[in-house]
From Swiss-Prot:
Heterododecamer (2C3:3R2) of six catalytic PyrB chains organized as two trimers (C3), and six regulatory PyrI chains organized as three dimers (R2). It catalyses: carbamoyl phosphate + L-aspartate = N-carbamoyl-L-aspartate + phosphate + H(+). Keywords: Pyrimidine biosynthesis, Transferase. It is an enzyme of class 2 (transferase). GO terms for molecular function: amino acid binding; aspartate carbamoyltransferase activity. Pathway: Pyrimidine metabolism; UMP biosynthesis via de novo pathway; (S)-dihydroorotate from bicarbonate: step 2/3. The lineage of its organism: Bacteria, Pseudomonadati, Pseudomonadota, Alphaproteobacteria, Rhodobacterales. PANTHER family: ASPARTATE CARBAMOYLTRANSFERASE, ORNITHINE CARBAMOYLTRANSFERASE, MITOCHONDRIAL. Belongs to the aspartate/ornithine carbamoyltransferase superfamily. ATCase family. The keyword Transferase applies. This is Aspartate carbamoyltransferase catalytic subunit.
Length: 320
């Protein structure tokens, strides 16, 4: 199993063989999570601190559950009650926590690059749970696992990513991962929500939903991220749904066996028709939630193995 990373800060740092290693290990954790006894000792004796500077339900609870199932001591830092609210900087907070000798820091932050900066200042492994518009690596990995289990492969597929591309770290991480794994990627969005220069990733750009979905194996919808918008990017939610919301009529242009994905939380009737989101024959949205726990277990397991090996080498060096 190949995984060389000291931290997991983005998909950009991973080679295809490392991506496959994460997915293969995550597959085994899917099996474990379906058992009555859902326990491993992979992180036994280790401390995991979750630092979420943005609100999160799915991701934070998924990381917490993943750590506990691996046997870690898990602490959720309540940012609203922390010294950050009293003016303490991110680095001061990180250095304070670093002095307590944690083994894993799971960090979500509204500023792109904040997690990379933090990782350069601490002695433990750092896992990016989403930073601004930059990256959300575990979301892309769990999406890849969901696709592989549904389609039998994660190569040579046509994947359409639709919606708020401009503000989405999920889109960016998926675009990078799918490209590394030799897939054909299409981005579908109104011009106001298509970031400049995104075509450099080798993807196809569309502002017509039906044309973009034609022959797609996978349809990945994205949430409208109003909290990151500082202007009028769409005329109205009603008009947006009419042109870019996924319904049965638009999905008919994709392959007959195309799967429907959404990272959540969903705005039903805006990004996707509620009936379609719940269609067990097409939607794999709940599978994504399940795969999220397994993928995060795999990522933390692999980072912990590398951390233990690094500490072991350091200890030998001290003895010598």
């Amino acid at each position: 199993m190949t995984f060389r990373a000291r931290h997991l800060l983005g998909i950009e740092q991973l080679a295809p063989d490392e991506i496959r290693s994460v997915l293969d290990l995550a597959d085994s954790y899917v099996d474990l999570n379906r058992r009555t006894m859902k326990q491993s000792d992979a992180l036994a004796g280790m401390t995991q601190i979750n630092m979420f500077f943005e609100n999160s339900t799915r991701t934070q609870s998924s990381f917490e559950l993943a750590g506990k199932r691996l046997g870690a001591d898990v602490m959720n830092m309540a940012v609203a009650q922390s010294s950050v609210k009293k003016g303490e900087t991110l680095l001061d907070t990180a250095m304070t926590l670093n002095a307590m000798h944690p083994d894993l820091l799971v960090v979500r932050h509204p500023a792109s690059g904040a997690v990379n900066l933090l990782a350069s200042k601490v002695n433990c492994a750092v896992l990016n749970a989403g930073d601004g518009r930059h990256e959300h690596p575990t979301q892309a990995l769990l999406d890849a696992l969901t696709i592989r289990r549904a389609k039998g492969r994660i190569q040579r597929l046509t994947v359409a990513i639709c919606g708020d591309i401009a503000h989405s770290r999920v889109a960016r991480s998926n675009l990078i991962l799918l490209g590394k794994m030799e897939n054909r990627v299409r981005l579908i969005a109104p011009p106001t929500l298509m970031p400049p220069g995104v075509g450099e990733f080798g993807c196809e750009l569309y502002d017509d939903m039906k044309k973009g979905l034609e022959g797609a194996d996978v349809v990945m919808m994205l949430r409208l991220q109003k909290e990151r918008m500082d202007g009028a990017f769409i005329p109205s939610e009603r008009e947006y749904y009419h042109r870019f919301g996924l319904d049965a009529d638009k999905l008919a242009f994709a392959r007959e066996d195309a799967i429907v994905m959404h990272p959540g939380p969903m705005n039903r009737g805006v990004e996707i028709d509620g009936t379609l989101a719940d269609d067990i024959n097409r939607s794999v949205i709940q599978d994504q939630v399940e795969m999220g726990v397994a993928v995060r277990m795999a990522c933390m397991d692999l980072l912990a193995r590398n951390l233990r090996a690094e500490r072991g080498r350091a200890a030998v060096g001290v003895m010598v």
